[in-house]
């Protein structure tokens, strides 16, 4: 932990807030008449956890992956609950047109690639709420680097804290991914509320390294069983965690189990 605190990237992370939310322009408030439309360009855990949470709350979440690069089966079963998934090649003109039409009618865009990786696709739209997830943030000497939970755990000193004198260790779960995913969903909801009231194109940014910095503080212990449930669907019977989002009158679980990866049409639910 001390080495990370002294590292230039560690100092950049420590000097910044846990997450950032920005208003980019004076676009008018959007008048939504149907379910919230969320376009999901994320992979593995953190981003998919965020969009899974939005799906729980009633959003129409459509995940887009490149053809031939499906999500890992276990990750798909865990994090694509409540969503539909489709494949589009954004380098193909016909697929790009389909994607642009989806983006034009989306309320939220969530991306989970390294900073700058998707810039060539011109993903900005007036009034859109965009949430960008990265490993290290888009600042500091590591700002443009790729990364994932386990690497960030080691870099930030969690590997030392959880390890032994002989070798580094790790948290018993990808806690940075899951924590960042839920924080991202909460930040999107706040930005949507502000967009509804005040207008403006909105940008949310989070990084696994920021969550790691936050989670290194002591957290209370708990018993996991009361947070688990089971569901039946096309992938069989799944045992999984309940959503951490709960409120009186709200949903207790997702509206649909994960289906077969990529089996849905690239269209919003009302048009499929």
Where do the language-model regions lie?
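Short glycine-biased active-site loop of nucleotidyltransferases that positions the nucleotide triphosphate
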Residues: 31, 77-78, 142-144
């Amino acid at each position: 932990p001390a080495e990370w605190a002294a590292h230039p990237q560690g100092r950049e992370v420590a000097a910044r807030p846990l997450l950032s939310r920005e208003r980019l322009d004076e676009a008018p408030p959007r008048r939504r008449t149907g379910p919230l439309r969320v376009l999901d360009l994320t992979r593995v855990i953190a981003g998919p956890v965020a969009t899974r949470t939005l799906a729980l709350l009633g959003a129409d979440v459509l995940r887009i992956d490149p053809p031939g690069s499906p999500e890992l089966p276990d990750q798909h079963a865990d994090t694509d609950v409540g969503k539909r998934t489709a494949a589009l090649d954004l380098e193909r003109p016909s697929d790009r047109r389909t994607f642009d039409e989806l983006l034009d009618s989306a309320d939220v865009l969530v991306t989970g690639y390294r900073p700058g990786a998707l810039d060539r696709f011109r993903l900005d739209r007036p009034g859109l709420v965009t949430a960008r997830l990265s490993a290290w943030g888009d600042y500091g000497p590591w700002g443009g680097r790729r990364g994932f939970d386990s690497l960030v755990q080691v870099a930030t000193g969690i590997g030392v804290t959880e390890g032994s004198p002989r070798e580094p260790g790790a948290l018993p779960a990808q806690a940075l991914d899951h924590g960042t995913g839920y924080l991202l969903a909460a930040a999107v909801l706040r930005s949507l509320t502000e967009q509804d009231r005040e207008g403006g194109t909105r940008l949310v940014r989070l990084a696994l390294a920021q969550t790691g910095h936050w989670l290194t503080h002591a957290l209370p212990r708990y018993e996991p069983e009361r947070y688990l449930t089971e569901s039946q669907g096309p992938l069989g019977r799944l045992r999984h965690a309940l959503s951490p989002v709960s409120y009186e009158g709200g949903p207790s679980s997702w509206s649909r189990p994960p289906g077969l990866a990529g089996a849905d049409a690239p269209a919003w639910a009302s048009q499929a």
